[in-house]
Amino acid sequence: MPKPKVRIIGGGLAGPEAALQAASLGCEVTLYEMRPHRSTEAHLTPDFAELVCSNSLKSESENSAPWLLKQEMRRADSFLLAAAHASQVPAGHALAVDRQKFSAWVTTLIDSNPDITVVREEVTRLDPGSDEITILATGPLTSPALTAELQRLTGSRHLAFYDSISPIVDAGSIDMDKVYLAARWDKGTADYINCPFTKEEYDRFIDALSAAETVPAKEWEHLPTAGQLLEDRLQRSGEEAHHSGSGAENPSLTATRPGAPGLASETWVSQNAQDVQNAPKTTPPPAPKYFEGCLPIEEIARRGHDTLRFGPMKPAGLTNPRTGRWPYAAVQLRQENLRADSWNIVGFQNHMKYSEQARVLRLIPGLENAKFLRYGQIHRNTYLNSPAVLTPTLQLKDHPRILIAGQLSGVEGYTESIAGGLLAGRFAAALAHGRIPEPPPRESAHGSLIHYITHSEAKNFQPANVTFDLLLPLEEELRKKIRDKKERHRIQCERALEAWDQWLSRSTE
């Protein structure tokens, strides 16, 4: 009997995990990836699971929310999490990987699997009437053509925020006489290079950062949204009608998004690009919308002179062995690969011009002669308004044979994306075998993420990392009885893992 087929589009993190899960559950998988024939503004290689931002899969501290999510993934035999452990580099209590080894490991897993066929071409059309189950896992850099196709199917405008990438420096260019190795609060091993600041050095750095020139916004970053264009067009049409004395409806205003009166589709925007040029020049473009968990340092600095000292440059817990005290501020560097010949500047994603980055970042103590292997940059992250279009099993409400996985679904972060792929692969396999998939329990970290992206208020939906705020809270009586936050988190994790194990046993029967 032939194996049921599953088609997966996207070779980032969610797609390969979904492919390996579905193949392990008896499906014949076709995995589509457009690279290298068409790349994105952030990718550098054609490999699967290329990490384009940091190299960290977050905390491994027991009973933390990121740890809980990874524990659930381990119990579900996540292939990419196993690859992360196989390519791990020292990073204190965090799980960080050698990017190239991690990507190579995943690529080998995919290429060597007899039940996975790789097709290197761009997919621009989706057939919701096909008998084949399809998982769309094209990530935050989904191509314009596929984004338009997805919009056509969902009748929903995609959303986006701007994400940034941290710089990487050559290890040999770091002045080790000015820095020191330590882990915050001495958790784990001393795997981070710490660059300590005095108050004077910090003030000078902030002044230079605040005055630095950023990369001019690309045209698409400042294009009015469909709603803004329509509102402007209505206003101009009203003015024309007022001057002409006509109250007749303007027929050109009827091209609105299906199912959403008053909002024009992005396709309509592209077909009426002339409106962009005709838009009022006095109206400033909207400020870029950033994900709060990954703000560019210049954006953080705009929020106050000392804001960075309470964020990426927080000195708390980083005792300088030369002084026996915490510095006024500190920048941390995390090892990029097993050779330890390159280090990334933790949390220092930015949108400055390259020449400005070199000038400003060389004000960091120990990096005065830094050689940059990669500068920071910014790119657009696209995601769906999932509460409006997705079911708790990641299926499109109107086209249930199409599933959405990874960052496109509204989760944020490497681990969360892999987790979404794990679920989508299992859901797709169940559907392909003629079964009804069961969503993960609300108590679990996976279930909490799914609940968030499918039950949030659609109007104000924003991507989310896994946190205890998303998890099912303890009963009020128990919360009052247990005051210690760590103990409450331990109980939440214990309940989550118990519910997850029960779900796993049911879903594999």
Regions found by a protein language model. Give the residues of each.
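Helical element adjacent to the flavin cofactor pocket in flavoenzyme catalytic cores
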Residues: 99-118
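C-terminal auxiliary extensions adjacent to catalytic cores
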Residues: 464-509
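Beta1/beta-strand and adjacent pyrophosphate-binding region of the FAD-binding site
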Residues: 2-14
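Predominantly flavin-linked oxidoreductase catalytic cores and closely associated redox partners
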Residues: 112-238, 280-339, 343-354, 358
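A glycine-rich dinucleotide-binding beta-alpha-beta segment and adjacent secondary-structure elements
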Residues: 345-411, 418-420, 438-455, 461-465, ...
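N-terminal FAD cofactor-binding segment of flavoenzymes
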Residues: 20-82, 443-449
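Internal hydrophobic alpha-helix adjacent to the cofactor/substrate pocket in enzyme cavities
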Residues: 418-438
